Swiss-Prot record:
Nucleotidyltransferase as UniProt keyword: no
Pfam families the UniProt entry points to: Ribosom_S12_S23
Family that this chain belongs to: Belongs to the universal ribosomal protein uS12 family.
InterPro entries, A to Z: NA-bd_OB-fold, Ribosomal_uS12, Ribosomal_uS12_bac
Taxonomic lineage: Bacteria, Pseudomonadati, Pseudomonadota, Betaproteobacteria, Burkholderiales
Keyword annotations: Methylation, Ribonucleoprotein, Ribosomal protein, RNA-binding, rRNA-binding, tRNA-binding
Chain intervals with Basic residues compositional bias: 113-126
Recorded coiled-coil stretches: none
Gene Ontology, cellular component aspect: small ribosomal subunit
Region (Disordered), start-end ranges: 1-28, 103-126
Organism: Paraburkholderia phytofirmans (strain DSM 17436 / LMG 22146 / PsJN) (Burkholderia phytofirmans)
Protein name (Swiss-Prot/TrEMBL): Small ribosomal subunit protein uS12
Keyword Chloroplast: no
Amino acid sequence: MPTINQLVRKGRQSETTKSKSPALQDCPQRRGVCTRVYTTTPKKPNSALRKVAKVRLTNGFEVISYIGGEGHNLQEHSVVLIRGGRVKDLPGVRYHMVRGSLDTQGVKDRKQARSKYGAKRAKAGK
């Protein structure tokens, strides 16, 4: 334990919190170009083919981003928007695609939670 004199001389050092999405550099979203679009398998108790993309951002970072929703139109050289948010069962995936912006289309026939998937409201007649 420090003495009063040591505290007067040095003071306490506050712990700095590390960013969970460093590639965004304190921005809400970042634009990037897909360099590879592929599927990968999740960690142990789960089983699926999760859609992910390797994206080169405008600030030079290269990150892996998750493509949420059923079906997508992304391929190499697609321009996409990335937001923070990890996928718990995919190691190294710390970002999500923003559906319905730039080259990423919204999810087709989506009825609920539409804003998260860039889906427009269905016509009243249908």
